[in-house]
């Protein structure tokens, strides 16, 4: 019979240590860094309970909570009761308390600031909330745009439902969005007017913010006479570019059903067509957030058509985020990775690419030179030179 080992000193027994009140010694004996272990567990808790943050952000956008605070004036802070008073009358006496808890959560993510003041005769404290620096991107600016629509899109039912099919897609193949809705996201837009409205607003708002920064920083539009915007939508990007460079003749190229709704823009001609078939000729071709929608095979078709449409020394100006080859933990690295997984889940073959992958595509399409020019608000402006 095997002999059961015993300790010559009963106090060495872990259970005895606990019973004798030496639990701290017991923990240190079995865990050399209990503080680090606690921090890791706390981080794990944050991950396990992370869903409320994006959903509270979505609700804050829908209720315009940040806009209400902004309207109060620069550096002003409002209590939840004051914010609730600015909402449409809903008849809910608990609204201030609910808003306080939601805004408290946003304060932990540095979306809003918070100052606790003495509640006076009511006892306790009253928390007042202001806008943290990041909040301005979720409040409509002078152009009427913000990232709020992007939150409404990503947290909307059409996209949220797709995530339920991610496991199935990993095991069996396919695109989660298509599995839920029976079609890809681009065709789905034609069946759901509300989704189409939110999608277009999200793309328009982000594009407006980015292109205005690009025209201030990127000097490659100089000396271009004819610029083709592939996938240009309603032509807003060319409106901004040509207003800054009046000598440019803009060709806004998109699908016919998109172009038919495009407004008249001085200096811009709207042309309907299919980028997989052919692309109008120009001195330069502009593509912002087009390649990330498609697989490498589809991107090569697009880029080869661009190559055919350009003169010698012509260029394609590509604006895309660049994945970093080794994961980092910066806000931008997380944003790009999150977008990449969104593309995997929602888009037919779309993905975010590394700079090396963009260079490989450029060379495979026949371009002689790949030139990353400048970094603008998370996006790279890259030139593919013929």
From Swiss-Prot:
The active site is at residue 292. An heterologous biosynthetic pathway of mescaline is reconstructed in Nicotiana benthamiana plants and yeast cells expressing Lophophora williamsii genes TyDC2, CYP76AD131, OMT1 and OMT11, thus providing a sustainable production of phenylethylamine-derivated natural products. Signal peptide: none annotated. It comes from the Eukaryota. S-adenosyl-L-methionine binds at residue 254. Its EC number is 2.1.1.-. Pathway: Aromatic compound metabolism; Alkaloid biosynthesis. S-adenosyl-L-homocysteine binds at residues 207, 231, 254, 274, 288. Changing residue 292 to A: Reduced activity toward 3,4-dihydroxy-5-methoxyphenethylamine. Lost activity toward 3,4-dihydroxy-5-methoxyphenethylamine. Keywords: Alkaloid metabolism, Methyltransferase, S-adenosyl-L-methionine, Transferase. It catalyses: dopamine + S-adenosyl-L-methionine = 4-methoxytyramine + S-adenosyl-L-homocysteine + H(+); 3,4-dihydroxy-5-methoxyphenethylamine + S-adenosyl-L-methionine = 3-hydroxy-4,5-dimethoxyphenethylamine + S-adenosyl-L-homocysteine + H(+); 3-hydroxy-4,5-dimethoxyphenethylamine + S-adenosyl-L-methionine = mescaline + S-adenosyl-L-homocysteine + H(+); 4-hydroxy-3,5-dimethoxyphenethylamine + S-adenosyl-L-methionine = mescaline + S-adenosyl-L-homocysteine + H(+). Homodimer. O-methyltransferase participating in the biosynthesis of natural products derived from phenylethylamine, including mescaline, a natural hallucinogen potentially used in psychotherapeutic treatments. Catalyzes the O-methylation of mescaline para hydroxyl groups, using dopamine, 3,4-dihydroxy-5-methoxyphenethylamine, 3-hydroxy-4,5-dimethoxyphenethylamine and 4-hydroxy-3,5-dimethoxyphenethylamine as substrates. Belongs to the class I-like SAM-binding methyltransferase superfamily. Cation-independent O-methyltransferase family. This is O-methyltransferase 11. The gene is OMT11.
